[in-house]
Structure formats: structure tokens, C-alpha cells
């Protein structure tokens, strides 16, 4: 039996062993094969990374912006050349099918492309005459060392909306990726090095609680970007803010999709199946609840069940597989417990994912509950799995009222051909990202990922102009130039 490789942290341009003696297995969720072991690093590791990044900031922040942008452009080119390899790593670590993994790689590359526009993004503004012989200019500067805490479900896309932009704008970065998906991170580091990355500018420390707390507490780290669950995100925001750091915390979701009587049912069902069960439901933009008007509900449910029956479940590397496993055994057990809870509380189970449970991997099949109410646990909680709740409503107003009761407000979608309904939905729904006749309203890199309510803690969102503001600070220079006498 081959020896299992133990991974190292990446600090100051080198792969270095952690100070820890604790390692966790990284497991392919479709096969339970142990891929490698990842260190559960210590605060001492974070301190080394932070000191290194702080030292590197002194020179990196002074590098000309076009030079920094060229390195990001080189990185984008290398990522594009290695798309298939990156997608393969996502599939074996995360469980997504190959098509989904390639899609994630594409979104990650888009984020790097956006960051490569740093010269224009860094530009400030000026006013030639604010008083007699007085002008003012507003300049952007990087803020220092930034910490990023990323989740398992998008191991490329989410880190790539963090560190490329922060680094392009002149900061240095410490990434704590998910301990479930380290091999993808290794490949990102390898390609970033080839792109011309200087030592100390980008650092990777694997770990769990100690690493998170080290990032939140270290005085050299000036800002923190987090993506993950609500309980952890709330903790990160509170503790980071207490330590006077700039924090953006993107957390949980319970996204609602509204289907009106005039919706194109074929397109609607196709979109909802993809949104609810793609990536095994493990994404913060997944469709978790459908509220459907009563006049079309029976037909909608029939078509939905018919579509779901065609879903192929299995290893994401296999041809034709749509639904892969959830990330680990704990997630599988948690999902099964929610199915039991839904039954206990009176929801009608019309597609039972327990029928697809297998000992070969962490599989749970597509699960659909009908006749769900807002008092039920399966409506309230973020399940983060291939479980969809359906609520029948009288009209759009009732559907919006139900969605607005949720503590989460990442995204919401509407399927209709009525322009008045679209406008009413846009103006009255409490959610930060809306989709009209599409299932996943995740924005492109140049728009903010703008969750509301308990889906986001902070002021400046990830992506778009918000990310530029988050990773920079401003300096306003006011200057008087006495009028010269050229006569």
C-alpha cells in the first residue's frame, strides 16, 4: 500500500511543514479513497505566515500597478491552459461532476480576469479647482495583509474572488482553504508561482479552529474575507471586528424560487432541477424552496418528479452523472436526519433521496418535499444538500411574504412572463441577488455578491467595485499652488 502524502503549508514561497502533529485525511467523497493528509496547523504557523506577508507587503505594495496586473494576466493564462486538470481535482476532492467542475474553473478564471484590470480599478479621482489655486485628488492604496477563509464547495471560484483581487491591488494574502479540498489549492499555488508571483505575497495555511482564530487575532492582518456557514461567519465577523479588522462575511442561504401560473413549465422545471440538485445542493445559491401558484402546482410537481427521475447519480468522473456525493459522512448523516425531520413534521415526501444511499460514497439522492409550511424545520434551516421544499401559494404576494420570513436573503428567483409581476417581485423581495426566469442568480465577477440579512455580515461585499473598496484605503491630497507670475 502506497504511503499517504502529507501536505505542507505554503509560506514565503516555500512548502513548509506545519508545527502541528495533527493531520486529517482528505477523502474522495464518491469512493472514500484517501487522497492525502492535510495538517491541522497552529497559531504559530499563522504567525510565521503573517510576519512573512507583512514583510513582503513593504515591497509588493510599491510594485507598479501594471506590473502587478501582468502577473495576474499570466496567472489567468495558465489557469486557462490547465482547465481540465483543475476540474479533475475539484471532482475527486469535492464530488462535482466534470461539467460542473469545468464551470467552476471558468468562473474562477473570470475573477482573475477582473483582477487583472487593476490599473483602471485602482484609479482615484480629482478636482482641479476646489478653491482659488487649490486642487484635490483621491488616491487608492492597499491596506496590508489580508486573510481569506474559504469553503469546500467552491474550492477554486471562491478563493479566486479573494486573493487575486487583493494581490492585484497591492496587498499580500494568507489563504486558509477548506481542509477538504487542498489538492486544488496546491495546483493554484503552482500556477501562480509560474506566473511570476514573488515570495511572501501569497501564503497558504491549512487548518481548523486555531488557524481561523489566528487570522482573526493577528495584529498584522488588517482585513478578512470569509465564506461559509452562518454560525462560523457570525463568529468571524464579531471577533474580527472586535480586533478592529475590516471584515466581510458571506454566510448561509435559503433561496426561494417563485413559479407563477404563466411560467413556461418546461424551462422552469429544467432550471429548478439544476439549481436545487446541481453540486449536490452544496452551494449558497442553490434553490432550496419553491413557492408555486396553486393553479399550476399539480402539473409543476408532475413534471418536476419526471425530470428528477432521469437524474443519474454517481462518481462525477463517470459519463452522464448529474448528481455526485455530498462532501463527507457527517453531511450525509445530517441530510438524512433532515429528511426524517420533514416526515415527522408532516411534509409529504415525493422523492426520497434515501433510496440512493450507498456505502461506496457519501451519496444522497434528490429529495423533494411537498406541502411544506414555514413552521417546519426543513423550511427554516439551511440544509446544504439535495433537498427541495415545495409550498403551494395563492399568488405572488403570498409567495414573497413567505420568502421574506426567512432569516436568509442571498438570492431569489421568479419564473413568469408577466412584466408587472417581475417589477413587483424586484421591488418587494428581500434578497440581494435576483433571477428572472433563471435558476441561479449568481452574478459575474464585476457585480457584487450581495447577500442580505443573515446571509451577509459586513458593509462591502465580495466581487465588483465593492471588492476594490474592501481591499483598498483612500488618501485625499489637497494642494495649493500659488498663482505664478509668468509675465
Swiss-Prot record:
Disruption phenotype: No effect on vanillin degradation. It catalyses: 3-oxopropanoate + NAD(+) + CoA + H2O = hydrogencarbonate + acetyl-CoA + NADH + H(+); 2-methyl-3-oxopropanoate + NAD(+) + CoA + H2O = propanoyl-CoA + hydrogencarbonate + NADH + H(+). Changing residue 351 to A: No effect at either the structural or enzymatic levels. Its EC number is 1.2.1.27. SUPFAM superfamilies: ALDH-like (SSF53720). Pathway: Polyol metabolism; myo-inositol degradation into acetyl-CoA; acetyl-CoA from myo-inositol: step 7/7. Changing residue 160 to A: No effect at either the structural or enzymatic levels. Keywords: NAD, Oxidoreductase. GO terms for biological process: inositol catabolic process; thymine catabolic process; valine catabolic process. GO terms for molecular function: malonate-semialdehyde dehydrogenase (acetylating) activity; methylmalonate-semialdehyde dehydrogenase (acylating, NAD) activity. Belongs to the aldehyde dehydrogenase family. IolA subfamily. PANTHER family: MALONATE-SEMIALDEHYDE DEHYDROGENASE. HAMAP family: IolA. Catalyzes the oxidation of malonate semialdehyde (MSA) and methylmalonate semialdehyde (MMSA) into acetyl-CoA and propanoyl-CoA, respectively. Is involved in a myo-inositol catabolic pathway. Bicarbonate, and not CO2, is the end-product of the enzymatic reaction. This is Malonate-semialdehyde dehydrogenase.
Amino acid at each position: 500500500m502506497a504511503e499517504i502524502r502529507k501536505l505542507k503549508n505554503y509560506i514565503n514561497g516555500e512548502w513548509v511543514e506545519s508545527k502541528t502533529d495533527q493531520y486529517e485525511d482528505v477523502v474522495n467523497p464518491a469512493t472514500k479513497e484517501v487522497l492525502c493528509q492535510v495538517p491541522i496547523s497552529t497559531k504559530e504557523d499563522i504567525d510565521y505566515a503573517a510576519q512573512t506577508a507583512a514583510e513582503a507587503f513593504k515591497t509588493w505594495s510599491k510594485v507598479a500597478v501594471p506590473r502587478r496586473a501582468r502577473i495576474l494576466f499570466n496567472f489567468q493564462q495558465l489557469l486557462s491552459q490547465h482547465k481540465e486538470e483543475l476540474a479533475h481535482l475539484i471532482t475527486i476532492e469535492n464530488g462535482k461532476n466534470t461539467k460542473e467542475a469545468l464551470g467552476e474553473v471558468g468562473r474562477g478564471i473570470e475573477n482573475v480576469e477582473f483582477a487583472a484590470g487593476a490599473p483602471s480599478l485602482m484609479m482615484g479621482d480629482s478636482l482641479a479647482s476646489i478653491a482659488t489655486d487649490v486642487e484635490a485628488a483621491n488616491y487608492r492604496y492597499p491596506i496590508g495583509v489580508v486573510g481569506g477563509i474559504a469553503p469546500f464547495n467552491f474550492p477554486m471560484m471562491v478563493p479566486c474572488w479573494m486573493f487575486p483581487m487583493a494581490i492585484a491591488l497591492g496587498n499580500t494574502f494568507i489563504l486558509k482553504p477548506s481542509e477538504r479540498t487542498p489538492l486544488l489549492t496546491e495546483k493554484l499555488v503552482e500556477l501562480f508561482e509560474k506566473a511570476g508571483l514573488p515570495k511572501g505575497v501569497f501564503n497558504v495555511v491549512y487548518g481548523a479552529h486555531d488557524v481561523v482564530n489566528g487570522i482573526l487575532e493577528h495584529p498584522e492582518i488588517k482585513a478578512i474575507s470569509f465564506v461559509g456557514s452562518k454560525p462560523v461567519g457570525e463568529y468571524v465577523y464579531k471577533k474580527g471586528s472586535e480586533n478592529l479588522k475590516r471584515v466581510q462575511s458571506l454566510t448561509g442561504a435559503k433561496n426561494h424560487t417563485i413559479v407563477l401560473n404563466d411560467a413556461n413549465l418546461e424551462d422552469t422545471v429544467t432550471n429548478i432541477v439544476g439549481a436545487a440538485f446541481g453540486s449536490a445542493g452544496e452551494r449558497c445559491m442553490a434553490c432550496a424552496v419553491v413557492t408555486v401558484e396553486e393553479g399550476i402546482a399539480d402539473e409543476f410537481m408532475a413534471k418536476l418528479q419526471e425530470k428528477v427521475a432521469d437524474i443519474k447519480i454517481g462518481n462525477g468522473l463517470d459519463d452522464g452523472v448529474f448528481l455526485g456525493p455530498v462532501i463527507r459522512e457527517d453531511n450525509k448523516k445530517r441530510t438524512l436526519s433532515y429528511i426524517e425531520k420533514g416526515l415527522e413534521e408532516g411534509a409529504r415526501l415525493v422523492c426520497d433521496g434515501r433510496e440512493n444511499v450507498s456505502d461506496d460514497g457519501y451519496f444522497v439522492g434528490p429529495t423533494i418535499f411537498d406541502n411544506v409550511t414555514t413552521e417546519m424545520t426543513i423550511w427554516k434551516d439551511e440544509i446544504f444538500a439535495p433537498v427541495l421544499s415545495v409550498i403551494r401559494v395563492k399568488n405572488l404576494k403570498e409567495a414573497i411574504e413567505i420568502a421574506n420570513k426567512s432569516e436568509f436573503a442571498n438570492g431569489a428567483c421568479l419564473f413568469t412572463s408577466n412584466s408587472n409581476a417581475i417589477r413587483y417581485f424586484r421591488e418587494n423581495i428581500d434578497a440581494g441577488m435576483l433571477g428572472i426566469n433563471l435558476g441561479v442568480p449568481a452574478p459575474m465577477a464585476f457585480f457584487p455578491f450581495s447577500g442580505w440579512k443573515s446571509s451577509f455580515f459586513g458593509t462591502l461585499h465580495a466581487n465588483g467595485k465593492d471588492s476594490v473598496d474592501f481591499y483598498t484605503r483612500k488618501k485625499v491630497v489637497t494642494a495649493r499652488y500659488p498663482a505664478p507670475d509668468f509675465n
